[in-house]
């Protein structure tokens, strides 16, 4: 199991880092007290999933050596690959971020009533043991949200860009538009196998439907055009820091034409090495009916 402990200065980007790790498939827990870390790790040992935990200044123990001892104990475990990811930023950057968001620093809330600058300085001192044990340190001073996300992804996975999952989904307009679609292609103008009595009971996954549709040049031309559209803009969409791209293809009932095109186009992108999911939402309704 890989365990990443995320910590850092308040306002340096811990929440962003945790969201990136969640997108990478990590089981994430925010603001776990250090004294519960061992018990938590023990409880998730069997889930067969990488884990990320954020440690906040508010839940650090009063004795700094307890942090070091806890992390040393976890690092000694043979079945745990421990990394400490520390998010840092310059005082000037943190002051600016707090000014822009108008949030209160966690250490300014206590009885000491510290100024923002004093709180930042104190936090830096209190987090020193974690910095010393960090295997990954990221300075977010000059990063925007997307740049920081890419840095975290690169440091953790060795690649900057998130691998986009392309979802190709067929549907029937009579059942309504899919709510999660990024792009919708209406293919109701194509020749319809529904009007061939022998083909009507079949679906777009069956060979006789393939043969019928592939006799029509407009079907093959549209397939090429949809593939070309997605291929052309995929690099830009991948740079947009998104996890999913959903392409919906619809015909009247979602049984023949849209199913055929969705399946063929999805398989085309699978063969190119992309992460692809193929769904036939309306086809499931026909089968249930």
UniProtKB/Swiss-Prot annotation:
Spell out the molecular function terms from Gene Ontology: ATP binding; GTP binding
* Residue positions binding ATP: 8-15
Q: What are the binding positions for GTP in this chain?
A: 56-59
Give one Pfam family, short name only.
Answer: PapZ_C
- Keywords assigned by UniProt? ATP-binding, GTP-binding, Nucleotide-binding
Record's keyword annotation contains Nucleotide-binding: yes
Q: Which InterPro entries does the UniProt record give? A: P-loop_NTPase, RapZ-like, RapZ-like_N, RapZ_C
Q: What does the record give as the function of this protein? A: Displays ATPase and GTPase activities.
Q: Which NCBIfam families match?
A: PRK05416.1
So what family is this one in?
Answer: Belongs to the RapZ-like family.
* Protein name stated in the entry: Nucleotide-binding protein VS_2760
């Amino acid at each position: 199991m890989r365990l990443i402990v995320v910590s850092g200065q308040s306002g340096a980007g811990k929440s962003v880092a945790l969201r990136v790790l969640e997108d990478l498939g990590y089981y994430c827990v925010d603001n776990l007290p250090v004294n519960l870390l061992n018990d938590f790790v023990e409880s998730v040992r069997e889930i067969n999933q990488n884990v990320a935990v954020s440690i906040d200044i508010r839940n650090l123990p009063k004795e700094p050596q307890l942090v070091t001892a806890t992390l040393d104990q976890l690092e000694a475990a043979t079945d745990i690959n421990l990394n400490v990811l520390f998010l840092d930023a310059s005082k000037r950057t943190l002051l600016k971020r707090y000014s822009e968001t108008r949030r209160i620093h966690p250490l300014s809330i206590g009885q000491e009533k510290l100024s923002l600058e004093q709180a930042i300085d104190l936090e830096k001192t209190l987090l020193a043991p974690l910095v010393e044990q960090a295997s990954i340190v990221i300075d977010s001073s000059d990063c925007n949200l997307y740049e920081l996300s890419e840095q975290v992804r690169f440091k953790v996975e060795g690649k900057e860009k998130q691998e986009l999952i392309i979802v190709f989904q067929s549907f029937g307009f009579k059942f309504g538009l899919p709510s999660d679609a990024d792009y919708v292609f209406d293919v109701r103008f194509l020749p319809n196998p529904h009007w061939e009595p022998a083909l009507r009971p079949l679906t777009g996954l069956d060979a006789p439907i393939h043969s019928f549709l592939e006799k029509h040049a407009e079907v093959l031309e549209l397939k090429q055009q949809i593939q070309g559209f997605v291929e052309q803009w995929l690099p830009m969409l991948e740079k947009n820091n998104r996890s999913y791209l959903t392409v919906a293809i619809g015909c009247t009932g979602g049984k023949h034409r849209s199913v055929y095109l969705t399946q063929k186009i999805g398989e085309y992108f699978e063969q190119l090495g992309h992460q692809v999911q193929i769904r036939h939402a309306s086809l499931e309704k026909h089968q249930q009916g």
